[in-house]
């Protein structure tokens, strides 16, 4: 029994199963190409590291220094009703109203 709706399709175009098989073949080719190019890239990186006397630690330090600049700020204000906080940067939340000092978070006082 012929499949309905197939009569309007181009008989020369590949069917669903053929396209799935092509995709699987392409996926395998992509994986193989990525693996080969990855090996080349690793070789180039190793050569540059040797040329400039770099270690993995040198690279890690650089990344850590860059990430340390993006530290989050400590909240200065807290809404007692919801527990939401605001650091004092950016747009002031509506819950602060006209008296932000009333919402200041008190630093922990040292024990006497």
Swiss-Prot record:
Answer yes or no on keyword Cytoplasm: yes
Q: Which UniProt keywords apply?
A: Cytoplasm, DNA-binding, Plasmid, Transcription, Transcription regulation
> Which SMART domains has this protein been placed in?
HNS
Q: Identify the GO cellular component terms for this protein.
A: cytoplasm; nucleoid
Q: Which GO terms describe its molecular function?
A: DNA binding
Keyword Transferase belongs to the record: no
What subcellular locations does the record give?
Answer: Cytoplasm, Nucleoid
UniProt main location, coarse: cytoplasm
The text of the family note is: Belongs to the histone-like protein H-NS family.
Annotated function? A DNA-binding protein implicated in transcriptional repression and chromosome organization and compaction. Binds in the minor groove of AT-rich DNA. Binds nucleation sites in AT-rich DNA and bridges them, forming higher-order nucleoprotein complexes and condensing the chromosome. As many horizontally transferred genes are AT-rich, it plays a central role in silencing foreign genes.
Do you know which PANTHER family this protein is assigned to? DNA-BINDING PROTEIN STPA, PTHR38097
Its protein name is: DNA-binding protein Bv3F
The organism's taxonomic lineage, starting at the top: Bacteria, Pseudomonadati, Pseudomonadota, Betaproteobacteria, Burkholderiales
